[in-house]
Amino acid sequence: FKDRKPEIPSAFHVQCDSFMFHKERMCRVLETKVPSKYKKLLFIDGDVIFSNDSWYSDISKLLDSHDVVQPFETCEWLDLTYTNVTLTRKSVLFMKESIWNYNYHPGFGWAFRREWYNKVGFFDWAISGSGDTLSSASWLKKSFPKIFKSLPTSLKPAYSEFAAKPVPRITYYEKSKIQHLYHGSKTNRQYVERHKIIDNELDIRKLITINKDGMYEWINKDKWNPLFLEYFQSRADDDLSDLPYRGPTS
């Protein structure tokens, strides 16, 4: 960001001067840097631990016959001592309802056949977060309840186009568990409230441009950067409080 020096000098770097959720767009940019000989991709959060040491090869085998794999069956959130489980949820693939149900988890990581990722992949416009929710709901052809705040109005035109794309052959990594390492209260992340920032009648695609590194930038930084900076500062990701939480997790 701006003139800040990278924390990992040997990593691949991009520059951006806009505050927003960049994950899905960064995945697109990163894919272009992966040598073409690799036909499978895995995007995984850096704060999770697998229970099975063979996860890498097992997920690779699943991608021989599937386009998309969620790399776990069960996920657990650990408390700040890393010893107690505060929340447990199943993979979103266990959702039987046709209407989206927050009691299953859509995040932490997704593996893809590279060909399918390039055809469809993630929903790239979730710049207020919930990209995993919106992406997996489309892949699984789930509809949303009448009161659903994770799809702000400005995203709806782009999401309608995304939802019309091909459905993947999708599965989960059976009998595998991952644990999420604690880093601040989930309550502070405002999984619902954050979407109000862009809940307006403007098409998100008309508010954003792509910079020289392939990253999204606000066209009007003076308007949108202060709003998103205030949100990110309020998250307190390193906070040591551990408040009970049972709401959305992505």
Explain the meaning of each model-derived region:
Residues 1-38:
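Active-site-proximal specificity loops/subdomain of glycosyltransferases
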Residues 3-8, 55-56, 80-85, 184-186, ...:
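Short aromatic-enriched loop/helix-cap "lid" or pocket-rim segments at secondary-structure transitions
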